[in-house]
A protein has these predicted regions:
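Conserved Class I SAM-dependent methyltransferase catalytic core
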Residues: 210-250
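Residues at the starts of beta-strands that form the adenosine-phosphate
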Residues: 99, 123, 157, 224
């Protein structure tokens, strides 16, 4: 997948300079904006573009767009505030300091929910291998604002790193984090028209989770490793897992 950087139509000089700066940082070619993205794709041979403008950058590929949003995080934190449980947060330590490493940042939903839940007693570091999702997420975190100031603060506290979790874990010292979390991309997602995420899927990394990676994660974490996957995932047959919980297909 070859990606370029461009701007909205009729961009002013400040937007163009920002796009050029980010293209250099990401190692993507900067392409001056033409008439249509379809024509630019045909002319350049690129498969998609990160587009910069007056608002947050977005990713475009084959007619599909992906913009920063936090999935169900707003709903989940609202429910937590009302005293209702969250399946992921219920697995985190109930008290004491807790530093979490989210190895699969993706849409930011899980990182944001955990960051809010751990306010005052923990920190979330998130990794994203895809340079596209990292860039959309980096800008999204920095510019995020919600009417709920506690959620705004939590999102902005997330420390997002552009990294492959395999390489990052290998470089970590023993017991560097309390909890390590994996939510790998489903290679065969359930198709729902109302949840069309083709732009996101086109940009995502699809690395397989192995027992070797989990053993490395166990070395790096002090308390537990959490994995979100389909119940039929073969990796759950390995005895490395001490607790498997299934609900609604996960």
């Amino acid at each position: 997948m070859r990606t370029g950087v461009t701007t909205i139509r009729h961009a002013d000089s400040s937007i163009i300079k920002e796009a050029q700066k980010r293209s250099e940082a990401l190692g993507f070619p900067y392409i001056p904006r033409g008439d249509t993205l379809e024509e630019m794709t045909e002319e350049t041979g690129l498969s998609g573009f990160l587009i910069y403008g007056k608002q947050l950058p977005l990713y475009w590929s084959d007619g599909e767009e992906y913009r920063f949003h936090m999935g169900t995080a707003v709903l989940r934190t609202t429910q937590l505030r009302k005293g209702n449980p969250d399946r992921l947060c219920a697995l985190l330590p109930a008290d004491g300091p807790c530093d979490v490493l989210d190895c699969t940042f993706g849409q930011a939903g899980d990182s944001s929910t955990m960051a809010w839940f751990l306010t005052g007693r923990g920190r979330v570091t998130a990794l994203e291998k895809s340079p596209i999702l990292y860039e959309v997420g980096r800008a999204g975190i920095a510019g995020y604002e919600d009417k709920d100031e506690s959620l705004t603060d939590a999102v902005r506290r997330i420390h997002l790193i552009h990294a492959d979790y395999r390489e990052y874990l290998a470089a970590c010292r023993d017991d560097a984090y309390d909890v390590i979390y994996f939510d790998p991309m489903f290679r065969h997602p359930v198709k729902r028209r109302e949840n069309d995420m083709e732009g996101f899927r086109a940009a995502a990394a699809y690395d397989s989770l192995t027992v070797e990676i989990l053993r490395e994660a166990l070395r790096v974490c002090r308390r537990k490793v959490i994995v979100k996957e389909r119940p039929f995932a073969g990796i759950f047959r390995d005895p490395i897992f001490t607790d498997v919980r299934m609900k609604r297909g996960q």
